Design a protein with these regions (language model features):
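Helix-adjacent hinge/juxtasegments
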Residues: 58-110
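N-terminal active-site segment of His-dependent metallophosphoesterases
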Residues: 1-58, 67-73, 151, 184-186, ...
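Beta-strand-turn-beta hairpins that frame and shape the catalytic cleft
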Residues: 1-7, 76-85, 126-131, 157-163
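A short C-terminal boundary segment appended to hydrolase-like catalytic domains
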Residues: 120-127, 160-234
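Conserved beta-sheet core of the metallophosphoesterase superfamily
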Residues: 95-161
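Active-site environment of divalent metal-dependent phosphoester hydrolases
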Residues: 14-17, 43-48, 66-73, 92-95, ...
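Short, glycine/charged-enriched secondary-structure capping and boundary segments
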Residues: 21-24, 51-55, 75-77, 100-101, ...
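Active-site neighborhood of phospho(di)ester-bond hydrolases with catalytic His/Asp-centered motifs
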Residues: 7-10, 36-42, 59-64, 86-88, ...
Length: 234
């Protein structure tokens, strides 16, 4: 079974609350490289809708609290062995509350529940079900947070295994913050995996500490020999 690459985005609000998606995101999100695109509503404009739809032949969206037209508020998508539920999230009170999300999940029996509305990226697990919020891909403001960092989720699904990449663009440094987790269908926990760059940095730090320790040992040995020599000369 081939892996399925799934983009999850929410709350674009382009151009109402944000002029556009950051160019760094657009260089990553190339048309026809993704098998599925799942949008959680509040896209903002026809142009934004068309851009998302151009990324994959399999595009799905749900109705946000600012969307108009005949769009479903709930949707289920089957990808591999995973039954994925989609809602915007304004139906959940308090917004983003895990217990409230769990109630919705139990009613519909989804393996993964995707929701937005808070504009803040979040991943949780409860009772062997996974809850993912991709944040706002444009970094548009919300009533909960005035200036969120732009973010989105990429999921790699293969059989009953999932890898979830969280992409966050730090507005101050203009650098990506990338995290990776792995989980299996029906598991009650997930594994946080450090990226290669972080591992390389830790290895460099360990090597630096080792060099400093060896240098200190040599200096201590020299001082010890020097003290012994001084004692003998007395």
């Amino acid at each position: 079974m081939n892996p399925e690459l799934v983009l999850v985005v929410g709350d674009m609000f382009v151009p109402q609350r944000s002029p556009d998606i950051d160019e760094q995101f657009k260089t990553i999100l190339i048309p026809n490289k993704l098998q599925h695109v799942l949008s959680l509503g509040n896209i903002g404009s026809r142009e934004s809708y068309d851009w998302l739809k151009s990324l994959s032949n399999d595009f799905h969206t749900v109705k946000g609290d600012f969307d108009e037209g005949d769009i479903s508020e709930k949707k289920v998508v089957q990808i591999g062995e995973f039954k994925i539920g989609m809602i915007h999230g304004h139906q959940v009170l308090p917004w983003g509350d895990l217990d409230a999300l769990t109630t919705i999940q139990r009613e519909l029996g989804w393996d993964i529940l995707l929701s937005g509305h808070t504009h803040q990226i979040d991943i949780k697990v409860k009772d062997k079900k996974f809850y993912i919020n991709p944040g706002s891909i444009s970094g548009s403001f919300s009533y909960l947070i005035a200036d969120p960092n732009p973010s989105f989720i990429l999921m790699v699904l293969q059989g009953e295994e999932a890898i979830v990449y969280s992409y966050i663009l730090n507005d101050k440094s203009q650098k990506f913050e990338l995290s990776k987790i792995e989980f299996s269908k029906g598991a009650n926990e997930y594994k946080i995996v450090k990226d290669e760059e972080e591992n390389e940095e830790e290895e460099e730090e360990d090597e630096d500490k080792k060099e400093k320790s060896e240098k200190k040992e040599k200096e201590d040995k020299k001082n010890e020999i020097k003290e012994e020599s001084n004692e003998e000369s007395k």
